Amino acid sequence: MIKVMHIFSRMNRGGAELRTMDTMKLLNREFEFHVCATSGKRGELDDELESMGITIHYLDIKKFSFPFKFIKLLKKKNIDVVHSHILFMSGLIQLLSFSANVRNRITHFRTSKDSKEQYNKIRKARNKVLKAIIEIFSTKILYVSNIANRNLISMKLFPKKHKTIYNGFEISNINKNFKKEENSFIYVGRFIHTKNQLFLLDVIEILKKEFNTNIEITFVGNIQTDYGKKFLSIANERGLNKNIKVIGEVNNPLDYLKTSEYFLFPSELEGLPGALIEAHHHNCIVISSNIKENSEVNQYFKDSSFELELIPKTWASTIKKLISRKKHISFNDSNVFDINMTTQELKEIYMSKTL
């Protein structure tokens, strides 16, 4: 049986981690999976992974001993495939994997850019070196979206190594006969700066003051962050507590998407936005920011997508028009993000002897 080791910083409930766990569930009988957490820390998904029979190894990539321990681990477990998801630090992972004679070395980019390098010249220089190492020592380089494919390594030394594979979702069993609550609004995602939930407070405020319209937005996702605390504080200061309903982190946000009519998504940065895809699959009317990553998804669901610049009044005006039923909405079906397609592509890559 082929042995595959996934590399993550920590197996918390993020999009890349959840989508990877979904593929492992489907392929668990055909491959032996391991996970290496390079933060050296346990994650929120560890218990579930261990219940699936997946071994998790904890090694701190910041420690001097990491390279030696990682190579030793790969050799001891006879790993055939290393599948790394830790952005440009995958360069170090693949160099070490090459040294350990791992046959298939996959680097998988799950975002479209490193937002931290913009103001850090040292990090930018470091990333340039790591990009070259990734190209040389990876046997396959995967991207979560075409935008990521174009942005992250624009000058490709080995074009045949590079491939876009969309995240997969279970869509064949979705029952579309759910009842939507009229004029119900939802946001799904953890509270961090790039998700831009504070923007929605501005939208709520303009709707109230300029359009005489009250809406309530349900927020599903981890709010136990510094940004989440800031969000709650500002909502309280502005007297908007009655306009927000905070659910927090849940195991299955789909139950909330099924009954919600509108999905709001003002992100400033995404890889391939999983929550956005799930919202489309559950026939939500989507109002999203017009970043390229969102556009790549929305192109498959044009009739129910409204892409807007991040201007609060524009969003407020659009919401007012939609709830006044001045626009007729129809929904498109698309299997582009079917998990069975994703799983088949990964299976072929894992089994390939010459990439």
Curated annotation (Swiss-Prot):
What pathway, per the record? Answer: Capsule biogenesis; capsule polysaccharide biosynthesis
Q: Which PANTHER family match?
A: GLYCOSYLTRANSFERASE WBBK-RELATED
Tell me the enzyme class.
transferase
Q: Which Gene3D superfamilies match?
A: Glycogen Phosphorylase B
Q: What is its EC number?
A: 2.4.-.-
Question: Per its database record, what is this protein's job?
Answer: Required for the biosynthesis of type 1 capsular polysaccharide.
Please give the biological process terms from Gene Ontology that the record holds. capsule polysaccharide biosynthetic process
UniProt family annotation: Belongs to the glycosyltransferase group 1 family. Glycosyltransferase 4 subfamily.
Q: Does the keyword Transferase apply?
A: yes
Q: What domain of life? A: Bacteria
User: This protein is called what?
Assistant: Capsular polysaccharide biosynthesis glycosyltransferase CapH
Q: Which organism is it from?
A: Staphylococcus aureus
- Which Pfam family, just one, is annotated for this protein? Glyco_transf_4
Q: Which InterPro entries match?
A: Glyco_trans_1 (IPR001296), Glyco_trans_4-like_N (IPR028098)
Q: Keywords on this record?
A: Capsule biogenesis/degradation, Exopolysaccharide synthesis, Glycosyltransferase, Transferase
Gene Ontology MF annotations: glycosyltransferase activity
